[in-house]
Amino acid sequence: MTMSVNKSTLVLKVGGALMQCEMGMARLMETAAKMIASGQQLIMVHGGGCLVEEQLTANGMTTEKLDGLRVTPQEQVPVIVGALAGTSNKILQGAAIKAGVTCVGMSLGDGDMVSAKVKDPRLGFVGEVSPKSATYLEFILSQGWMPIVSSIAIDAAGQLLNVNADQAATVLAKLVDGKLVLLSDVSGVLDGKGQLIKSLNRSQVEELTNIGVIEKGMKVKVEAALEVAESMGQPVQVASWRHAEQLIALSNGEAVGTQIQPD
């Protein structure tokens, strides 16, 4: 299959809520199949917060968060790895295969894609990753396959680390010089009245964070988007998987959801 070289790779980050919505997954994967057939290279990066919560509860464990980031104590690592690199990854792979997408399920630990280290000892086994080698990803993309990547990384000492999926997607977008799209179950960043904000830069984000309009999970998402927008000098989209068909417009250069702008 010959791939078009003029479209940059789209890195789609999806959240755990998608996996609880079969129709949403089906629509997203059907859209992905159309985009890949038209020569668009896609990488999907996923979290799986809801599944992680379910598994922790089933194991009698509780979740603690610090500034919107999950704290990962040693005893929770096997459960979190199983929920993310195992169940969540394979649920998405199943939906992709059903829609006719040839995909490769993997984690951040594969193919020397990233280097990983502990982010902050207060967060336990939470990792921070930086881009390393694009060779493995580029080979998979060159075949017309879609990588589906869980946010589990492995450091140089072999320690498994839980990485925030928004940060994971940011690093993979840098690695392949692609466009980052953060998909969640809301259509983008909403103002205090629930209206979609079409475009934001750093000073506007800081202002909305200070008055409590952007908080918790959306704060982490917007900060990840700002980081990649500024380091790559191009806008990042925050949009909804509920309107997957909009991604085709995005791949044609149109704006959807909220555009996070580099200053």
Curated annotation (Swiss-Prot):
Protein's UniProt name: Acetylglutamate kinase
A GO BP entry: L-arginine biosynthetic process
Top EC class for this record: transferase
Localisation: Cytoplasm
Keywords: Amino-acid biosynthesis, Arginine biosynthesis, ATP-binding, Cytoplasm, Kinase, Nucleotide-binding, Transferase
Annotated metabolic or biological route of this protein: Amino-acid biosynthesis; L-arginine biosynthesis; N(2)-acetyl-L-ornithine from L-glutamate: step 2/4
Gene behind the chain: argB
A Pfam short name: AA_kinase
The UniProt record lists the keyword ATP-binding: yes
Annotated InterPro entries: AceGlu_kinase-like_sf, AcgluKinase_fam, ArgB, Asp/Glu/Uridylate_kinase
Residues that hold substrate according to the record: G48, G49, R70, N162
GO cellular component, one term: cytoplasm
Coiled-coil segments on the chain, per record: none
Keyword Transferase among UniProt keywords: yes
GO molecular function: acetylglutamate kinase activity; ATP binding
Family: Belongs to the acetylglutamate kinase family. ArgB subfamily.
Entry's EC annotation: 2.7.2.8
